[in-house]
């Protein structure tokens, strides 16, 4: 009897873990699809819901940051980008978005620090380094005038 109970508990536990993992994956996939369809409010809701089940999902934080950027909510954008980078320090897209925020703030010492990190991790967004350098150069030129 004890063995049967043990087996049933194991099966129930396994199903709960599997269901939660599957559900959170579905939330993210659905959120990403909604984002791509420009249904940002629904995407935001599902991304946040996904984080309830999987609080260490850097992709959900990144998509929330993108949505908040579209909504011009810099505080939430930055908060979600920082969460993304905390969980996935080599996320190029999040790093570039943070650099962009710091450039807009004219925080050039921070940009140069982040740029050095970005250059170490870039694999697919390396062309953005030129853009960063141009923006820094434009600031230096306008400062000299």
Which functions belong to the PLM regions below?
Residues 63, 97, 131-135:
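Canonical tetratricopeptide repeat
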Residues 49-50, 83-84, 117-118:
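Canonical positions in the second alpha-helix
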Residues 36-37, 70-71, 104, 121, ...:
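Register position in tetratricopeptide repeats
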Residues 25-49, 53:
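Alpha-helical segment of the N-proximal tetratricopeptide repeat
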